[in-house]
From Swiss-Prot:
Gene3D superfamilies: P-loop containing nucleotide triphosphate hydrolases (3.40.50.300). PANTHER family: ADENYLYL-SULFATE KINASE 1, CHLOROPLASTIC (PTHR11055:SF63), BIFUNCTIONAL 3'-PHOSPHOADENOSINE 5'-PHOSPHOSULFATE SYNTHASE (PTHR11055). Keywords: ATP-binding, Kinase, Nucleotide-binding, Phosphoprotein, Transferase. This is Adenylyl-sulfate kinase. HAMAP family: Adenylyl_sulf_kinase (MF_00065). The keyword Nucleotide-binding applies. ATP binds at residues 31-38. It comes from Aeromonas salmonicida (strain A449). Its EC number is 2.7.1.25.
């Protein structure tokens, strides 16, 4: 790796940020499958688009169709999945974007890795907190049913651990509130934290 150097661009991250009129950052949604991460990230992206913000949503399922299509779901593969996503998110932040990510990202260490990669001022952890029973009841993809039947191994919340964030920047309880109300909570918290 000693022959590889980082190429400095003539247009800086700050210049890109100023051109877009926004502060680039990553809004990292984490929580169990079925907690509402993708739904909330998508709704927040729509709200930010209405405000003229330049965004991109990296969704766990979509990323596994390409960038991380070669990975499985054991602990090592999950960690590599999040490492890759973190690197892509960092490049997008450098481009001046507000990046929303929706990944179970079950391990604190992998989320901290991404936080450290970006820096504390460019990483907002959003814990979408829904009880396991609620997630199983929702089960939009039928994955909990398959995991309970033994058809899926290493499924977070069933036979693989989820390590809830200890101090997320934003903690959303999602056990029945309308999506619009949760997006309002998100926007308020992001503004109060000077992230937007």
């Amino acid at each position: 790796m000693s022959n590889i150097v980082w190429h400095q661009h003539a247009v800086s991250k700050q210049s890109r940020s100023e051109l877009k009129g926004q502060k680039p950052l990553v809004i990292w949604f984490t929580g169990l499958s079925g907690a509402g991460k993708s739904t909330l990230a998508g709704a927040l992206e729509q709200a930010l688009a209405v405000e003229g913000k330049h965004t991109y949503l990296l969704d766990g399922d979509n990323v596994r169709h390409g960038l991380c299509g070669d990975l499985g779901f054991d602990d090592a593969a999950r960690q590599e999945n999040i490492r890759r996503v973190g690197e892509v998110a960092k490049l997008m932040v450098d481009a001046g974007l507000i990046v929303l990510t929706a990944f179970i990202s079950p391990f604190r260490a992998e989320r901290e890795l991404v936080r450290n990669l970006l820096g504390a001022d460019e990483f907002v952890e959003v814990f979408v907190d829904a009880p396991l029973a609620v997630c199983e009841e929702r089960d939009p993809k039928g994955l909990y049913k398959k995991a309970r039947a033994g058809e899926i191994r290493n499924f977070t919340g069933i036979d693989s651990a989820y390590e809830a964030p200890k101090q997320p920047e934003i903690h959303l309880l999602n056990a029945g509130k309308p999506v619009a109300a949760l997006v309002d909570e998100l926007l308020t918290a992001l503004r109060q934290g000077n992230y937007l």
